Amino acid sequence: MNTQKQEAERMKEIYQSSVKEVLGQMGSREEGLTIKEVEKSREKCGWNELAEGKKKSVLEIFLEQYKDFLVIILIASAIISGILGDAESAAVIVIVITMNAILGTVQTVKAEQSLQSLKKLSGPEAKVLRNGTVTPIPARELVVGDVILLEAGDYVPADGRLIENASLKIDESALTGESLAVEKSLDEIEEEVPLGDRNNMLFSGSFVTYGRGRAVVTSVGMQTEVGKIAGLLKSTSEKQTPLQVNLEEFGKKLSVLILVFCGILFGISVFRGENIGSAFMFAVALAVAAIPEALSSIVTIVLSFGTQKMAKEHAIIRKLQAVEGLGSVSVICSDKTGTLTQNKMTVEDYYIEGRRIRADEIDMADPAQRFLLDCSILCNDSTNENGVEIGDPTETALINLGSRYGVEAAEVRESYPREDEIPFDSDRKMMSTLHRIDGENRMIVKGAVDRLLDLTDQIWTENGIREITKEDKEKIQSQNQEFSMEGLRVLAFTFREIPEEHLLTAEDEDHLVFLGMIAMMDPPREESKAAVEECIKAGIRPVMITGDHKITAAAIAKRIGILKDLSEACEGAEIENMSDEELRGFVPKISVYARVSPEHKIRIVRAWQERGNIVSMTGDGVNDAPALKQADIGVAMGVTGTEVAKDAAAMVLTDDNFATIVKAVENGRNLYRNIKYAIQFLLSGNFGAILAVLYASIAGLPVPFAPVHLLFINLLTDSLPAIALGVEPHTSDVMNEKPRPADESILTKDFLSKIGLEGLVIGVMTMISFLTGYHQDGALLGSTYAFGTLCLARLFHGYNCKSDHPVIFTKRFFNNKWMQGAFALGAILITAVLTIPGLHQVFKVETLNFEQLGTVYLYAFACFPIIQLLKWVRGKLSE
């Protein structure tokens, strides 16, 4: 903590210090370091690279699959089965849990690569001044004190303080979330400001869009801002999804219930005078049979099917459990730039001749409007050739406006070639170019509204050019203020006539004619508003977290429905000194956070989590990565997103569409519901088997099932319908429900009562069938009847578990081809076992004739209408 504090104080001194002072602090000079000084600096500060994180091997990932409590119980069951001589059961259990581990490993084998991706951002090469000579070197060889040279198109290879500036503009959006390129300055900054406002500093991983400059390196490797994010990624642990927590709790509760049942059975057997050893072996065998061995594998398979469905809908799942976790999300914390917005500056409005005109309503036949468009293209250094945009995003937006109206920049520039220019700089806050237009030399001046109004004498109106009045200037200032309050970036355009063969000087930037203003912004994605509305309908709180300015963020948030009132917006500085407890009470009041750092993002996400919420964080920049990892479900943008963000996320959107997240939430809710249906199916069937065995034991009857019967049920008549239930067709009605509580258990009282009631029906019908066969021809026929009835009853029961409501006589009964297939295959197999003479010894059954087979089918089918009737009664009672 002290080291971080010292580092913060040092950075504060750097951006608040003059160029001369910083060079002194870094032990450097304008002509750079000597080789000896480089070696000395490297000994002190190390290489310009990020520390490696320890990667998990495939074997470690594979072994982690065995940490699940239910899997541990199954392993213990396999060992006990082996000791008791039941090799078949032991082998099946081992095969099932091994298959589950392989499936889980295949899905998660892409280990975290965040630090590797961060290393790529450091850039492969840097131009450095050493001994007064410019030398290209690998970026990792840079040291504190090196003087680096930068120009448009370069990535910044390390953090540094600017010492020479020629109109330098840097795109820092990946690091700060700021959508506009930042104009850099040499001036020291007096007050303490956040990262995005340190305009005399350069940061590793950012990109030069315009101009050139020199900087002295102030931090390398893990001490850079990117390095600090790498440190946050290392210290941020992944959270378990609600399903992981639920299944662990479920496994523990289920084990206790089964042990209680088996204990009761053991006590009854001993009380009846049976051998203690035999009674114990039977109780253990029953426990092994009662545990749904296939559950872990079925959940994994269902989630894998879910990932395939979501991939077709533009959402790639990197971490399997995230599929279900999405269904629990109650808060979505979204980055603004590139997530809710298009990450592309776009012209929104014109202001000309005293009127505001929407960008899509410009009249190219109007001389003033066309001249303003031409001026915006001519006084502009950006290009757009064959769809490749080069230059400052603000200037590119002006070129793209022309393209929308069929006005190509190359043609305009060819018609009115540039004869002279005064480049933009942050002191003048303007740029001037000279062109021959309609036989006259015209200087076009583009810049900040306030600055140009001070230099303006005349104004273009619909009645011609006249002297500008105080009222004109007030009206322009008022419109500029209105644009700013809407989060728009505004440029003013002016012009004047220049004498023939005159070279431009700064003195010429006076006595100008005010032409108009062009307002632009990074606009919301078209689908963002509808997606936000869907979130709110589904009980999900959308929150915007961005490094951009508060006014800009609030304007976007208001457009798409996240923000209702400006009081719901705040800046990172406001939460800087809050304790964690204060922040927990503060977050429900705020919908927009602006000018936040990566540390702020993590704290905001954590505060929501500590309030009991499941939080999804979306983003695309390096600055989002730690919060993506802290969130329960991190979501990265696949097209505009950095590799760092993608590697830290649980889900990547291939269409960068915020609406895809809402669809993913719907899929997650449906998958959780389907998994519950599968669990209901497995447990109610197993409970029916336990009740049948328990009744036989109490009544002093022979055991109704042989071990091979239980194996057959577990492998076929359990697994196939359970998987089919897992892929039950999705419905949109789940989005009308509120998110389920994060701590809601799968085994609720209501859920257990359903399992108990349905298991009782299956158990009773199985024992009636057993007694029918037993009284007809003894224990073997009784066992055959019980085995056949239990298998078929569970196949029919698959249809009961398709919904919480009766499905008979509804379209839902036939809407799952996988269920039809599972039922048909299961019925064919059990019919074959019961009727083919050659199989009776293998499966310990008596071969049945068609009349006997019909009896078994009748008892099995009887379970279906009874349970459907019970569902109808429960529904009526709940109303």
Regions found by a protein language model. Give the residues of each.
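Conserved cytosolic headpiece of P-type ATPases
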Residues: 1-736, 746-747, 760, 787, ...
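Alpha-helix capping/termination and helix-coil
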Residues: 380, 612, 665, 669, ...
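Helix-coil boundary and interhelical linker segments in multi-pass alpha-helical membrane proteins
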Residues: 697-706, 770-782
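Generic alpha-helical transmembrane segments
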Residues: 717, 762, 784-798
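Membrane-water interface at loop-to-transmembrane-helix junctions
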Residues: 741-760, 780-785
